[in-house]
Amino acid sequence: MKIISAEQVHQNLNFEELIPLLKQSFSRPFSMPQRQVYSLAPEQSENHDAFALLPSWNEEVIGNKAFTYFPDNAKKHDLPGLFSKIMLFKRQTGEPLALVDGTSVTYWRTAAISALASQLLSRKNSQHLMLFGTGNLASYLVKAHLTVRDIKQVTLWGRNAKKVSKLIADFSILYPAVTFKTSVDVNAEVASADIICCATGAKTPLFDGNSVSAGCHIDCLGNHMTDARECDTTTILRARVFVDSLTNTLNEAGELLIPMAEDAFNKDEIVGELADMCKTPSMLRQSSDEITLFKSVGTAISDLVAAHSVVEKLAD
Protein backbone atom coordinates (compact mmCIF):
# COMPACT_ATOMS: atom_id res chain seq x y z
CA MET A 1 0.00 0.00 0.00
CA LYS A 2 1.32 3.41 -0.97
CA ILE A 3 1.49 6.40 1.36
CA ILE A 4 0.95 9.55 -0.71
CA SER A 5 1.95 12.94 0.67
CA ALA A 6 0.48 16.39 0.13
CA GLU A 7 3.51 17.29 -1.99
CA GLN A 8 2.82 14.34 -4.30
CA VAL A 9 -0.84 15.37 -4.58
CA HIS A 10 0.11 18.92 -5.60
CA GLN A 11 2.66 17.63 -8.11
CA ASN A 12 0.19 15.33 -9.84
CA LEU A 13 -3.07 17.28 -10.02
CA ASN A 14 -4.01 20.04 -12.44
CA PHE A 15 -7.37 21.59 -13.25
CA GLU A 16 -7.10 21.03 -17.01
CA GLU A 17 -7.35 17.29 -16.32
CA LEU A 18 -9.23 17.15 -13.02
CA ILE A 19 -12.30 19.19 -14.01
CA PRO A 20 -13.23 17.03 -17.04
CA LEU A 21 -12.37 13.88 -15.07
CA LEU A 22 -14.84 14.87 -12.34
CA LYS A 23 -17.52 15.64 -14.93
CA GLN A 24 -16.98 12.22 -16.47
CA SER A 25 -17.05 10.50 -13.07
CA PHE A 26 -20.30 12.19 -12.01
CA SER A 27 -21.83 11.01 -15.29
CA ARG A 28 -21.05 7.35 -14.51
CA PRO A 29 -22.39 4.95 -11.84
CA PHE A 30 -21.13 5.52 -8.31
CA SER A 31 -22.32 4.99 -4.75
CA MET A 32 -22.06 7.56 -1.98
CA PRO A 33 -23.75 6.72 1.34
CA GLN A 34 -24.61 9.63 3.60
CA ARG A 35 -21.51 10.83 5.32
CA GLN A 36 -21.24 10.61 9.07
CA VAL A 37 -20.26 13.75 10.95
CA TYR A 38 -19.75 13.36 14.68
CA SER A 39 -19.69 16.37 16.97
CA LEU A 40 -16.92 16.16 19.55
CA ALA A 41 -18.29 19.04 21.58
CA PRO A 42 -20.21 18.75 24.86
CA GLU A 43 -23.92 19.49 24.68
CA GLN A 44 -24.86 23.18 24.82
CA SER A 45 -21.30 24.09 23.88
CA GLU A 46 -20.35 26.57 21.16
CA ASN A 47 -17.38 24.35 20.33
CA HIS A 48 -17.59 22.98 16.76
CA ASP A 49 -14.87 20.28 16.92
CA ALA A 50 -15.90 17.34 14.73
CA PHE A 51 -14.83 14.02 13.23
CA ALA A 52 -16.25 12.78 9.93
CA LEU A 53 -16.22 9.74 7.65
CA LEU A 54 -17.07 10.03 3.95
CA PRO A 55 -17.37 6.68 2.10
CA SER A 56 -17.87 6.23 -1.65
CA TRP A 57 -17.05 3.86 -4.48
CA ASN A 58 -17.27 3.51 -8.24
CA GLU A 59 -16.44 0.73 -10.69
CA GLU A 60 -12.70 1.10 -10.10
CA VAL A 61 -12.03 1.97 -6.49
CA ILE A 62 -13.49 2.13 -2.97
CA GLY A 63 -12.64 5.03 -0.71
CA ASN A 64 -13.22 6.43 2.73
CA LYS A 65 -12.14 9.92 3.67
CA ALA A 66 -11.68 10.65 7.36
CA PHE A 67 -11.18 14.15 8.66
CA THR A 68 -11.02 16.08 11.90
CA TYR A 69 -12.24 19.67 12.15
CA PHE A 70 -10.93 21.81 15.02
CA PRO A 71 -11.74 25.44 14.09
CA ASP A 72 -9.96 26.92 17.11
CA ASN A 73 -6.63 25.25 16.33
CA ALA A 74 -5.09 28.31 14.71
CA LYS A 75 -5.54 30.67 17.65
CA LYS A 76 -5.07 28.07 20.40
CA HIS A 77 -2.36 25.77 19.07
CA ASP A 78 -0.95 27.39 15.90
CA LEU A 79 -2.15 24.39 13.92
CA PRO A 80 -4.43 23.93 10.90
CA GLY A 81 -8.10 23.45 11.69
CA LEU A 82 -8.46 20.50 9.34
CA PHE A 83 -6.60 17.20 9.07
CA SER A 84 -7.63 14.53 6.60
CA LYS A 85 -6.64 11.19 5.06
CA ILE A 86 -8.24 9.21 2.23
CA MET A 87 -8.01 5.41 2.25
CA LEU A 88 -8.39 3.72 -1.14
CA PHE A 89 -9.08 0.05 -1.90
CA LYS A 90 -9.23 -1.85 -5.18
CA ARG A 91 -12.87 -2.29 -6.22
CA GLN A 92 -12.44 -5.82 -7.63
CA THR A 93 -10.57 -7.38 -4.71
CA GLY A 94 -10.88 -5.01 -1.75
CA GLU A 95 -7.10 -4.88 -1.47
CA PRO A 96 -5.73 -1.71 0.20
CA LEU A 97 -4.34 0.54 -2.49
CA ALA A 98 -3.16 3.80 -0.93
CA LEU A 99 -3.43 6.24 1.95
CA VAL A 100 -3.58 9.73 0.43
CA ASP A 101 -3.24 13.11 2.12
CA GLY A 102 -6.81 14.35 2.24
CA THR A 103 -6.31 18.03 3.01
CA SER A 104 -4.49 18.72 -0.25
CA VAL A 105 -7.00 16.67 -2.22
CA THR A 106 -9.81 18.67 -0.62
CA TYR A 107 -8.39 21.96 -1.91
CA TRP A 108 -8.11 20.64 -5.45
CA ARG A 109 -11.45 18.87 -5.66
CA THR A 110 -13.37 21.72 -3.98
CA ALA A 111 -12.07 24.28 -6.46
CA ALA A 112 -12.50 21.87 -9.36
CA ILE A 113 -16.14 21.19 -8.46
CA SER A 114 -16.78 24.92 -8.08
CA ALA A 115 -15.30 25.59 -11.51
CA LEU A 116 -17.16 22.64 -13.03
CA ALA A 117 -20.44 24.08 -11.78
CA SER A 118 -19.48 27.47 -13.21
CA GLN A 119 -18.60 25.83 -16.51
CA LEU A 120 -22.02 24.15 -16.61
CA LEU A 121 -24.15 27.03 -15.31
CA SER A 122 -22.48 30.38 -15.95
CA ARG A 123 -22.76 32.25 -19.22
CA LYS A 124 -20.00 31.28 -21.62
CA ASN A 125 -18.96 34.93 -22.00
CA SER A 126 -18.54 35.46 -18.23
CA GLN A 127 -15.54 37.72 -17.59
CA HIS A 128 -15.89 39.17 -14.07
CA LEU A 129 -15.36 36.86 -11.10
CA MET A 130 -16.22 38.15 -7.62
CA LEU A 131 -14.49 36.05 -4.98
CA PHE A 132 -15.45 36.23 -1.31
CA GLY A 133 -12.74 34.74 0.89
CA THR A 134 -8.98 34.94 1.34
CA GLY A 135 -8.32 31.54 2.88
CA ASN A 136 -6.32 28.61 1.52
CA LEU A 137 -8.91 27.92 -1.16
CA ALA A 138 -8.67 31.34 -2.80
CA SER A 139 -5.69 30.58 -5.03
CA TYR A 140 -7.20 27.27 -6.13
CA LEU A 141 -10.56 28.86 -6.94
CA VAL A 142 -9.00 31.59 -9.06
CA LYS A 143 -6.88 29.13 -11.01
CA ALA A 144 -9.79 26.72 -11.52
CA HIS A 145 -12.13 29.42 -12.81
CA LEU A 146 -9.48 30.77 -15.17
CA THR A 147 -9.35 27.24 -16.57
CA VAL A 148 -13.04 27.15 -17.55
CA ARG A 149 -13.87 30.77 -18.39
CA ASP A 150 -12.06 33.66 -20.06
CA ILE A 151 -11.99 35.74 -16.88
CA LYS A 152 -10.70 39.29 -17.39
CA GLN A 153 -11.33 40.73 -13.91
CA VAL A 154 -11.32 39.28 -10.41
CA THR A 155 -12.65 41.31 -7.49
CA LEU A 156 -11.55 39.98 -4.13
CA TRP A 157 -13.34 40.54 -0.83
CA GLY A 158 -12.00 39.64 2.59
CA ARG A 159 -12.18 40.83 6.18
CA ASN A 160 -8.39 41.13 6.44
CA ALA A 161 -7.22 43.99 4.21
CA LYS A 162 -3.59 42.88 4.39
CA LYS A 163 -4.44 39.38 3.16
CA VAL A 164 -6.53 40.84 0.34
CA SER A 165 -3.66 43.11 -0.75
CA LYS A 166 -1.14 40.26 -0.56
CA LEU A 167 -3.31 37.95 -2.66
CA ILE A 168 -3.96 40.64 -5.25
CA ALA A 169 -0.22 41.27 -5.57
CA ASP A 170 0.51 37.55 -5.89
CA PHE A 171 -2.30 36.91 -8.38
CA SER A 172 -1.27 39.90 -10.50
CA ILE A 173 2.16 38.35 -10.97
CA LEU A 174 0.80 34.88 -11.71
CA TYR A 175 -1.91 36.05 -14.12
CA PRO A 176 -0.76 39.32 -15.74
CA ALA A 177 -3.56 39.25 -18.33
CA VAL A 178 -6.20 39.47 -15.58
CA THR A 179 -7.09 42.60 -13.58
CA PHE A 180 -7.28 41.99 -9.83
CA LYS A 181 -8.87 44.53 -7.51
CA THR A 182 -10.22 44.77 -4.00
CA SER A 183 -13.90 45.26 -3.26
CA VAL A 184 -14.77 48.76 -2.09
CA ASP A 185 -18.56 48.63 -2.38
CA VAL A 186 -19.65 44.99 -2.04
CA ASN A 187 -23.12 45.28 -3.50
CA ALA A 188 -21.91 47.42 -6.40
CA GLU A 189 -19.27 44.82 -7.23
CA VAL A 190 -21.85 42.04 -6.90
CA ALA A 191 -24.06 43.88 -9.38
CA SER A 192 -21.31 43.85 -12.01
CA ALA A 193 -20.16 40.25 -11.44
CA ASP A 194 -20.79 37.43 -13.90
CA ILE A 195 -19.75 34.76 -11.39
CA ILE A 196 -19.88 35.14 -7.59
CA CYS A 197 -17.88 32.59 -5.63
CA CYS A 198 -18.31 32.47 -1.83
CA ALA A 199 -15.67 30.59 0.16
CA THR A 200 -15.84 32.05 3.66
CA GLY A 201 -16.68 31.14 7.20
CA ALA A 202 -19.40 33.80 7.28
CA LYS A 203 -22.34 33.24 9.60
CA THR A 204 -24.56 35.82 7.89
CA PRO A 205 -25.14 36.74 4.21
CA LEU A 206 -22.24 38.39 2.43
CA PHE A 207 -24.31 40.56 0.08
CA ASP A 208 -27.82 41.77 -0.66
CA GLY A 209 -29.57 39.37 -3.02
CA ASN A 210 -31.33 42.28 -4.70
CA SER A 211 -27.93 43.45 -5.97
CA VAL A 212 -27.33 40.34 -8.07
CA SER A 213 -27.69 41.09 -11.77
CA ALA A 214 -29.65 39.03 -14.26
CA GLY A 215 -27.53 36.28 -15.78
CA CYS A 216 -25.20 35.92 -12.81
CA HIS A 217 -24.01 32.54 -11.53
CA ILE A 218 -23.46 32.16 -7.77
CA ASP A 219 -21.44 29.46 -6.04
CA CYS A 220 -21.66 29.04 -2.25
CA LEU A 221 -19.14 26.56 -0.86
CA GLY A 222 -17.81 27.92 2.41
CA ASN A 223 -20.57 27.09 4.88
CA HIS A 224 -21.41 23.65 6.28
CA MET A 225 -23.61 24.69 9.19
CA THR A 226 -27.39 24.65 9.42
CA ASP A 227 -27.63 28.02 11.19
CA ALA A 228 -25.21 29.99 8.98
CA ARG A 229 -25.29 31.09 5.36
CA GLU A 230 -23.26 32.99 2.78
CA CYS A 231 -26.27 34.23 0.79
CA ASP A 232 -29.68 35.52 1.85
CA THR A 233 -33.17 34.23 1.18
CA THR A 234 -33.67 36.77 -1.60
CA THR A 235 -30.74 35.28 -3.50
CA ILE A 236 -32.18 31.77 -3.19
CA LEU A 237 -35.62 32.89 -4.35
CA ARG A 238 -34.23 34.74 -7.37
CA ALA A 239 -32.12 31.81 -8.55
CA ARG A 240 -32.53 28.37 -10.07
CA VAL A 241 -30.84 26.31 -7.37
CA PHE A 242 -28.55 23.32 -7.92
CA VAL A 243 -26.59 21.32 -5.32
CA ASP A 244 -23.69 18.89 -5.25
CA SER A 245 -25.63 16.39 -3.11
CA LEU A 246 -29.25 16.64 -2.01
CA THR A 247 -28.69 14.48 1.06
CA ASN A 248 -25.69 16.42 2.30
CA THR A 249 -26.95 19.93 1.58
CA LEU A 250 -30.35 19.27 3.14
CA ASN A 251 -28.57 18.12 6.28
CA GLU A 252 -25.96 20.86 6.48
CA ALA A 253 -26.55 23.93 4.32
CA GLY A 254 -28.08 26.93 6.05
CA GLU A 255 -28.35 28.65 2.67
CA LEU A 256 -31.23 26.26 1.94
CA LEU A 257 -32.41 25.25 5.40
CA ILE A 258 -32.99 28.79 6.69
CA PRO A 259 -35.28 29.80 3.76
CA MET A 260 -37.06 26.45 4.19
CA ALA A 261 -37.61 27.18 7.89
CA GLU A 262 -39.04 30.55 6.85
CA ASP A 263 -41.48 28.71 4.53
CA ALA A 264 -39.99 30.76 1.69
CA PHE A 265 -38.34 27.86 -0.14
CA ASN A 266 -39.13 24.18 -0.68
CA LYS A 267 -36.64 21.39 -1.31
CA ASP A 268 -38.67 20.40 -4.38
CA GLU A 269 -37.55 23.68 -5.95
CA ILE A 270 -33.96 22.40 -6.13
CA VAL A 271 -33.42 21.70 -9.83
CA GLY A 272 -30.93 18.87 -9.43
CA GLU A 273 -27.66 17.47 -8.14
CA LEU A 274 -24.25 17.68 -9.76
CA ALA A 275 -24.63 14.18 -11.22
CA ASP A 276 -27.84 15.31 -12.93
CA MET A 277 -26.11 18.43 -14.21
CA CYS A 278 -23.31 16.37 -15.76
CA LYS A 279 -25.67 13.90 -17.43
CA THR A 280 -28.52 16.19 -18.53
CA PRO A 281 -27.40 19.36 -20.33
CA SER A 282 -31.02 20.35 -21.00
CA MET A 283 -31.54 21.09 -17.29
CA LEU A 284 -28.77 23.69 -17.15
CA ARG A 285 -29.00 27.43 -17.86
CA GLN A 286 -32.26 28.16 -19.66
CA SER A 287 -31.60 31.77 -20.68
CA SER A 288 -28.90 34.43 -20.63
CA ASP A 289 -30.70 36.47 -17.98
CA GLU A 290 -31.57 33.82 -15.41
CA ILE A 291 -29.66 33.65 -12.12
CA THR A 292 -28.21 30.26 -11.20
CA LEU A 293 -26.90 29.14 -7.81
CA PHE A 294 -24.83 26.09 -6.91
CA LYS A 295 -24.58 25.11 -3.25
CA SER A 296 -21.91 22.60 -2.32
CA VAL A 297 -20.83 21.09 0.96
CA GLY A 298 -18.42 18.58 -0.56
CA THR A 299 -18.83 15.03 -1.84
CA ALA A 300 -16.93 11.85 -1.06
CA ILE A 301 -16.96 10.78 -4.70
CA SER A 302 -14.99 13.88 -5.73
CA ASP A 303 -12.39 13.04 -3.06
CA LEU A 304 -12.25 9.48 -4.36
CA VAL A 305 -11.79 10.50 -7.99
CA ALA A 306 -9.10 13.09 -7.29
CA ALA A 307 -7.16 10.82 -4.93
CA HIS A 308 -7.34 7.88 -7.35
CA SER A 309 -6.08 10.11 -10.15
CA VAL A 310 -2.94 10.82 -8.12
CA VAL A 311 -2.44 7.11 -7.39
CA GLU A 312 -2.73 6.23 -11.08
CA LYS A 313 -0.27 8.93 -12.13
CA LEU A 314 2.30 7.75 -9.61
CA ALA A 315 1.89 4.19 -10.88
CA ASP A 316 2.74 5.16 -14.47
UniProtKB/Swiss-Prot annotation:
Entry keywords, A to Z: NAD, NADP, Oxidoreductase
A Pfam family hit: OCD_Mu_crystall
Entry EC no(s): 1.5.1.49
GO molecular function, one term: oxidoreductase activity
GO cellular component: cytoplasm
The reaction(s) this protein catalyses: L-proline + NAD(+) = 1-pyrroline-2-carboxylate + NADH + H(+); L-proline + NADP(+) = 1-pyrroline-2-carboxylate + NADPH + H(+)
InterPro entries per record: NAD(P)-bd_dom_sf, ODC_Mu_crystall, ODC_N
UniProt pH dependence: Optimum pH is 6.5 for Pyr2C reduction and 10.5 for L-proline oxidation.
NCBIfam families assigned to the protein according to its UniProt record, in alphabetical order: PRK06141.1
Description of how the protein assembles with itself and partners: Homodimer.
Recorded family membership: Belongs to the ornithine cyclodeaminase/mu-crystallin family.
Function (record text): Catalyzes the reduction of Delta(1)-pyrroline-2-carboxylate (Pyr2C) to L-proline, using preferentially NADPH over NADH as the electron donor. Together with LhpH, is involved in a metabolic pathway that converts trans-3-hydroxy-L-proline (t3LHyp) to L-proline. To a much lesser extent, can also reduce Delta(1)-piperideine-2-carboxylate (Pip2C) to L-pipecolate in vitro; however, this activity has likely no physiological significance in vivo since C.psychrerythraea probably possesses no ability to metabolize D-lysine via the L-pipecolate pathway.
Protein name, UniProt field: Delta(1)-pyrroline-2-carboxylate reductase
Organismal lineage: Bacteria, Pseudomonadati, Pseudomonadota, Gammaproteobacteria, Alteromonadales
